[in-house]
């Protein structure tokens, strides 16, 4: 099977300078979801039709997958029919009979639905549409004959009949031949017009029925919001089924690549940004925001914690309230419980970082790195001016501003000595 992805539309109804397929769904561009589906289907070849505005970003996203993806620009003929023609021409020396055409703005279509359509091909149909029930009048509708055969796809504003998603599976030679016979409407070729042409030539057209939420296209911000809501519902259901505890599922938000193992507990109002993996037994408390980080077994994060920038929280660690960790690693059983910022640092095992500790990692031009060893104690309200190395079993006195390395088992004190004036209040 070969796959064609049509992603050259301008998306003017999004009212945005950002191309439609690059808007985010599940914290990833819409088109990434379609590329992920294509990757799961393991086609022999794949072609994506884009425009100049998205060609570079799409090529970069395609590189994240194992697809043999050929990117071509929309040809002179506008419309989905023109795009499909350009794509099929790019698939030179065809070796596959079947071609699957996907739309770049239909991100939630799943493998099961596509496989159902492909199975329908094997039962006699030459072209198979993906249809769904919808009250939304923006979609084309399947028109059936008296015997139940597909006659055409109507583009009126009514909501009678099944809507079509645009995705089509079929035999390459059949689709190519039908595309070649289409006429332009309003200066464009419409891919769905091949349905009427097929019916006129007694070519059997079938359809499979999908869930509207999976088959919907995204054309407006409202559509994007609906798709995001359903994406989150699917993610929540998947994690609950796999053994993750979500104490209030509707208040937890995931990304396309979120990985959470069984026996993790997630409390309300947690946001998982891109690139997060959480190992078994960890607990994420409310109002925490995680992105590009690895939370290992038994760690506790939050509430009100932010972990980001390729950070690692090791086994049994505690990251408490109002703590931010960026581009840092926290060793096994270490704790940073309150009101702290750790940036560009490596913290060893069994180290305690006191409340209000700040690692000053930016010198005005570059980020600097600090290392704190195993079994260290960092007193409250300490400031560590990177780059600093603190040896194993060392301690930093509360309120210190550390600007020099500390050898193992040493105590660093960097603050003014206290002055006490007896009876000061009485004299005044």
From Swiss-Prot:
Catalysed transformations (reactions): alpha-D-glucosamine 1-phosphate + acetyl-CoA = N-acetyl-alpha-D-glucosamine 1-phosphate + CoA + H(+); N-acetyl-alpha-D-glucosamine 1-phosphate + UTP + H(+) = UDP-N-acetyl-alpha-D-glucosamine + diphosphate
Enzyme Commission number, as recorded: 2.7.7.23, 2.3.1.157
InterPro entries according to UniProt: Bifunctional_GlmU (IPR005882), GlmU-like (IPR050065), GlmU_C_LbH (IPR038009), Hexapep (IPR001451), Hexapep_transf_CS (IPR018357), MobA-like_NTP_Trfase (IPR025877), Nucleotide-diphossugar_trans (IPR029044), Trimer_LpxA-like_sf (IPR011004)
Essential cofactor(s): Mg(2+)
Major place of residence: cytoplasm
Pathway assigned to this chain's UniProt record: Nucleotide-sugar biosynthesis; UDP-N-acetyl-alpha-D-glucosamine biosynthesis; N-acetyl-alpha-D-glucosamine 1-phosphate from alpha-D-glucosamine 6-phosphate (route II): step 2/2; Nucleotide-sugar biosynthesis; UDP-N-acetyl-alpha-D-glucosamine biosynthesis; UDP-N-acetyl-alpha-D-glucosamine from N-acetyl-alpha-D-glucosamine 1-phosphate: step 1/1; Bacterial outer membrane biogenesis; LPS lipid A biosynthesis
Keyword vocabulary terms for this entry: Acyltransferase, Cell shape, Cell wall biogenesis/degradation, Cytoplasm, Magnesium, Metal-binding, Multifunctional enzyme, Nucleotidyltransferase, Peptidoglycan synthesis, Repeat, Transferase
Co-factor binding details: Binds 1 Mg(2+) ion per subunit.
Gene Ontology MF: a single term: UDP-N-acetylglucosamine diphosphorylase activity
CDD domains with a match to the protein in the record: LbH_GlmU_C (cd03353)
Binding site for acetyl-CoA: 355, 361-362, 398, 415
Region ranges (Pyrophosphorylase): 1-221
Binding-site residues, UDP-N-acetyl-alpha-D-glucosamine: 6-9, 20, 74, 79-80, 103-105, 140, 219, 308, 326, 341, 352
GO biological process, one term: UDP-N-acetylglucosamine biosynthetic process
Record has Repeat as a keyword: yes
Region (Linker): 222-242
Assembly notes: Homotrimer.
Family of this protein: In the N-terminal section; belongs to the N-acetylglucosamine-1-phosphate uridyltransferase family. In the C-terminal section; belongs to the transferase hexapeptide repeat family.
Protein name, per record: Bifunctional protein GlmU
């Amino acid at each position: 099977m070969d796959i064609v992805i049509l992603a050259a539309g301008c998306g003017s109804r999004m009212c945005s300078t950002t191309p439609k397929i690059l808007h985010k769904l599940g914290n990833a561009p819409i088109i990434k979801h379609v590329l992920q589906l294509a990757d799961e289907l393991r086609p022999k070849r794949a072609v994506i039709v884009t425009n100049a505005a998205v060609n570079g970003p799409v090529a970069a996203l395609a590189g994240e997958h194992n697809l043999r993806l050929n990117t071509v620009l929309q040809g002179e003929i506008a419309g989905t029919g023109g795009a499909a023609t350009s794509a099929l021409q790019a698939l030179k020396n065809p070796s596959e009979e079947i071609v699957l055409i996907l739309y770049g703005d239909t991100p939630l279509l799943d493998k099961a639905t596509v496989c159902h359509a492909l199975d329908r091909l094997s039962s006699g149909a030459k072209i198979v549409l993906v249809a769904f029930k919808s009250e939304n009048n923006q979609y084309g509708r399947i028109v059936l004959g008296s015997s139940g055969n597909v006659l055409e796809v109507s583009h009126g504003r009514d909501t009678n009949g099944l809507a079509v998603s645009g995705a089509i599976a079929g035999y390459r030679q059949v689709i190519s031949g039908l595309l070649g016979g289409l006429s332009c409407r309003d200066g464009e070729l419409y891919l769905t017009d091949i349905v009427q042409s097929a019916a006129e030539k007694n070519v059997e057209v079938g359809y499979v029925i999908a869930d509207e939420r999976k088959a919907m296209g995204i054309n407006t911000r409202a559509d994007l919001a609906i798709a995001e809501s359903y994406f989150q519902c699917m993610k929540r259901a998947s994690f609950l089924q796999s053994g993750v505890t979500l104490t209030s599922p509707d208040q937890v938000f995931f990304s396309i690549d979120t990985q959470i193992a069984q026996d993790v507990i997630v409390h309300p109002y947690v946001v998982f940004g891109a690139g997060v993996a959480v190992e078994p037994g960890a607990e994420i408390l409310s109002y925490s925001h995680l992105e590009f980080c690895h939370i290992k077994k038994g760690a506790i994060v939050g509430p009100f914690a932010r972990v980001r920038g390729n950070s690692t929280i090791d086994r049994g660690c505690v990251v408490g309230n109002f703590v931010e960790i960026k581009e840092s690693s926290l060793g096994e059983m270490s704790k940073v419980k309150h009101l702290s910022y750790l940036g560009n640092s490596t913290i060893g095992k069994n180290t305690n970082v006191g409340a209000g500790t700040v690692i000053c990692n930016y010198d005005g031009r570059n980020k600097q790195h600090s290392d704190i060893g195993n079994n260290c104690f960092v007193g409250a309200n300490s400031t560590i001016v990177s780059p600093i190395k603190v040896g194993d079993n060392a301690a930093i006195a509360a309120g210190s501003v550390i600007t020099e390395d500390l050898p193992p088992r040493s105590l660093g004190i960097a603050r003014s000595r206290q002055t006490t004036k007896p009876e000061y209040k009485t004299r005044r």
